[in-house]
Structure formats: structure tokens, C-alpha cells
């Protein structure tokens, strides 16, 4: 689809919380413009996600700059080799920051070999322990690691009182059912609009609307009809419409329920 053929971005008739994006890829006027444009289409709050040792402070600074932006702290599984006792102490301190809502993006990713499984598991478990200490939810990334994800979550879900979300869910229905049974939310994004993502759409159809969170994972995974350009929170209306259609509810109902889900999970 050419740029000229792309439809305008709808303005949502309801509030929405962007539960997962990476605003640290933007700065200056581009960051300000993205935030303003997102508000114009109905995005009320934005959660920007930490992934590496280097960007912990950056996302906190972005959150501090705006009353409706919040953040997380944690190491992505690709960055698991950075996990150490010293980083753990830093994370404990940062978790108490008033704009830090959750520990994440943490988890397991065996699709890429950025860190070996044992290193990833150690970082995952260590960061979950800090979430338990601070009564924070977790933002989990899992890819090609279903059994180890189940094993880790089975051992901690009782202690993890606020649970959290399996973000950008693309795994099996079996893992979805397990995570739901353990009390976690599932996060869905532009992948749901992709032609070859029928597996994700099937999980959405079978996930109770009360357990769904909406996200973009910007600047990645831009939804159709804007696929091919950098993603941003202001594309959430296309994701909301797709999920509403799959759940056979109005966009207004979806927004009402997922807004409350987001509050319950993070705030």
C-alpha cells in the first residue's frame, strides 16, 4: 500500500493506555511531536520500556518530563549478560522511583543467541525477585522458550502478587492458557494485523477481553496499513480496531475494558 493510499489515523472515542513502547529512540521535537500526536488520537498514558543497562536512566528521564508518561526498569533477555549483583542493586534502587511502574522488559529469548539460556534464566529470576520485593508487576518477553518460561513463572507466580503482562504475545495457545491461569495479562500489538499472524489472532479470539492489554512496541511492528514506517503510539487505533473485530465487540467496549485492565495491571 502506497503512502498516498493509507487512511487517516482514527481518533479514538475513548481513552487508551499505551502499555509498551520505546520512546528513547526519539528525542527533541520528534519526541514531543509523537507524544502530542498520540494524545490527539486518544492515548492518555504511555509506558516507555527499559531494555539495557544503558537506557535505564534515559527512560526515567523521559517519564519525569511528562505527567502522563511512565516507565519500567530491567534488562531484556538479549542483555542478560549485563546482569550482575551491582546491576541488581541499581535496579532495587530504581524500582522505588515514583515513575517506575514495573520491572521489565525481562524474560527469555532463545530465538536469538545473544545470551545462553542459563544466563538468561539467572537474569530473569533475579529481576523477578526484585519485582516481588517492591510489589511491582513484570513485563515479560518470551520467544522460543515456552517450557523454561513456564518453569520460571510456576515457581514465582504465587509470590508475584501483581503478576504483569506477557508482552507482544506470539507464542502458542498452550502458553497463553498457562499464563492466563497464572494471572498474567497478554499484550497484543501490530502483529495482529499482519497477514501471516493467524496464530496470534487465534490467541486473541480465545483470550478473555478482561485479560488483554494493548501496545505498539514502537518503533517496531507497525500495524497495517502503516507497516513499513517507524511505529508510534498514535497507531494504537488500528490495533484497537483489529482486536475489537476479533473479539466481536465495539471499539468503545474494547477501550473501556482494556483501559481498566491497564490500570489494574500497572497503576
Please give the residue ranges for each predicted region.
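Mid-domain alpha/beta scaffold segments of enzyme catalytic cores
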Residues: 1-267
Amino acid at each position: 500500500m502506497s503512502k498516498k493510499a493509507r487512511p487517516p489515523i482514527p481518533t479514538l472515542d475513548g481513552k487508551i493506555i499505551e502499555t509498551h513502547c520505546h520512546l528513547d529512540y526519539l528525542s527533541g521535537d520528534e519526541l514531543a511531536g509523537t507524544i502530542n500526536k498520540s494524545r490527539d488520537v486518544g492515548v492518555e498514558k504511555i509506558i516507555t520500556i527499559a531494555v539495557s543497562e544503558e537506557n535505564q536512566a534515559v527512560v526515567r528521564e523521559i517519564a519525569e518530563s511528562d505527567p502522563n508518561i511512565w516507565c519500567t526498569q530491567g534488562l531484556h533477555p538479549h542483555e542478560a549478560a549485563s546482569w550482575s549483583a551491582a546491576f541488581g542493586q541499581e535496579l532495587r534502587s530504581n524500582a522505588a522511583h515514583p515513575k517506575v511502574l514495573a520491572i521489565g522488559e525481562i524474560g527469555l529469548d532463545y530465538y536469538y543467541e545473544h545470551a545462553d539460556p542459563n544466563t538468561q534464566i539467572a537474569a530473569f529470576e533475579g529481576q523477578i525477585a526484585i519485582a516481588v520485593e517492591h510489589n511491582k508487576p513484570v513485563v515479560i518477553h518470551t520467544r522460543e522458550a515456552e517450557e523454561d518460561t513456564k518453569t520460571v513463572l510456576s515457581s514465582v507466580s504465587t509470590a508475584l502478587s501483581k503478576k504483569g503482562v506477557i508482552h507482544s504475545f506470539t507464542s502458542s495457545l498452550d502458553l497463553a492458557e498457562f499464563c492466563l491461569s497464572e494471572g498474567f495479562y497478554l499484550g497484543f500489538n501490530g502483529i495482529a494485523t499482519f497477514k501471516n499472524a493467524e496464530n496470534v489472532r487465534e490467541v486473541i479470539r480465545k483470550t478473555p477481553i478482561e485479560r488483554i492489554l494493548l501496545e505498539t512496541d514502537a518503533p517496531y511492528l507497525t500495524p497495517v496499513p502503516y507497516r513499513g514506517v517507524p511505529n508510534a503510539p498514535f497507531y494504537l487505533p488500528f490495533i484497537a480496531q483489529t482486536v475489537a473485530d476479533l473479539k466481536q465487540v465495539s471499539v468503545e467496549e474494547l477501550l473501556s475494558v482494556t483501559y481498566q485492565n491497564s490500570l489494574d495491571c500497572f497503576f
